[in-house]
């Protein structure tokens, strides 16, 4: 089986976790893999799309194509699998009107014409089902060889509440900052560590700022005592696939999250982490975890187990291979 994967950039987290980390497994199981960046100019597009007939399957990662361009690609590809891990059919959080006609038109046009869709969560699956019944949920997964549980905390002053992410999601942490500042006035024994390419300031809470790098990501995660994933409850956020939580679980951290979208599936409230639905719950649950080291450790162990059982590369790579083989072998004409 020959597959062409079209991606935005190997530097993008989504590409690494949804596509590139699966490539070694696919090759080990006899799949010929070719990786291509999405072309920018029409000559580049015609050049690439003209080669697609040689592949059994073309895998597109999270791009919404203009209908005319997608139709040109569709005519050249035997089979198309589309991978989606964000609510691309909506505008991002904070927009006055989350609905976008242009995005919806592109999304609907593509979904009606691809052979199969791999969705990162059940919300995205439900969006796809309006147009195409050939869809399966494959959660974002971690290669556990790159993550080990942090050792017991050494004696140190205070607790580190950690947040790791991209600048585009820093707004969710900004919304949590007043709660952290209010909590610090009551319990001034913690610091906030932000691992990102952008940062926040606080005149109340001590903030440690660390530029994100792939090489130091695991080390930075292990410097946290508690991992947080605040979100807003909107259509865009419901499409998120919980990568932060999985990374926290990877090093055995307890997690507090807003129970939106897949967060509700990954985190079992009170078992491997806590849900925080409002400011009061954020305060109460952060305080409880900061004061109880044994609880932090127990939740972290359960979180790691959750990761191993349902969100690991070892579990989900065979599932992806099975999906791709099934689509490539399907009889009948493409849409």
Q: Language-model segments: what does each one mean?
A:
Residues 10-25, 143-149, 154-223:
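Conserved catalytic-core segment of nucleotide-activated headgroup transferases in glycan assembly
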Residues 269-280, 288-294:
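Conserved acidic donor-binding segment of nucleotide-sugar-dependent glycosyltransferases
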Residues 313-335:
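C-terminal alpha-helical cap of glycosyltransferases
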């Amino acid at each position: 089986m020959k597959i062409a994967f079209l991606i935005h950039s190997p530097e993008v987290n989504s590409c690494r976790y949804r596509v590139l980390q699966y490539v070694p497994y696919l090759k080990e199981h006899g799949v010929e893999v070719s990786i291509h960046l999405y072309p920018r100019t029409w000559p580049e597009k015609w050049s690439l799309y003209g080669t697609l007939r040689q592949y059994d399957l073309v895998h597109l990662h999270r791009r919404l194509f203009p209908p005319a361009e997608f139709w040109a690609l569709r005519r050249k590809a035997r089979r198309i699998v589309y991978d989606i891990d964000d609510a691309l059919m909506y505008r991002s959080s904070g927009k006055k009107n989350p609905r976008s006609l242009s995005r919806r038109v592109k999304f609907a046009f593509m979904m009606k014409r691809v052979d199969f869709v791999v969705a990162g969560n059940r919300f995205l699956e439900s969006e796809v089902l309006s147009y195409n019944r050939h869809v399966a949920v494959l959660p974002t997964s971690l290669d556990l060889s790159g993550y080990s549980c942090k050792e017991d905390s050494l004696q140190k002053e205070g607790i580190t509440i950690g947040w790791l992410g991209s600048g585009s999601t820093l707004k969710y942490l900004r919304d949590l900052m007043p709660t952290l500042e209010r909590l610090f006035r009551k319990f001034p024994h913690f610091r906030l560590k932000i691992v990102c390419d952008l940062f926040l300031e606080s005149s109340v809470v001590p903030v440690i700022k660390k530029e994100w790098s792939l090489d130091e990501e695991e080390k930075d995660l292990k410097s946290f005592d508690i991992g947080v994933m605040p979100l807003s409850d909107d259509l865009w956020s419901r499409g998120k696939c919980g990568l932060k939580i999985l990374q926290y679980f990877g090093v055995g951290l307890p997690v507090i999250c807003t129970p939106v979208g897949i967060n509700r599936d990954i985190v079992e409230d009170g078992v491997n982490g806590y849900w925080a639905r409002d400011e009061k719950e954020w305060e109460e649950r952060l305080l409880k975890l900061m004061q109880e080291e044994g609880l932090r450790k127990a939740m972290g162990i359960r979180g790691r187990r959750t990761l191993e059982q349902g969100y690991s590369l070892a579990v989900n790579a065979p599932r992806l291979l099975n999906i791709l083989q099934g689509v490539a072998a399907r009889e009948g004409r493409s849409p």
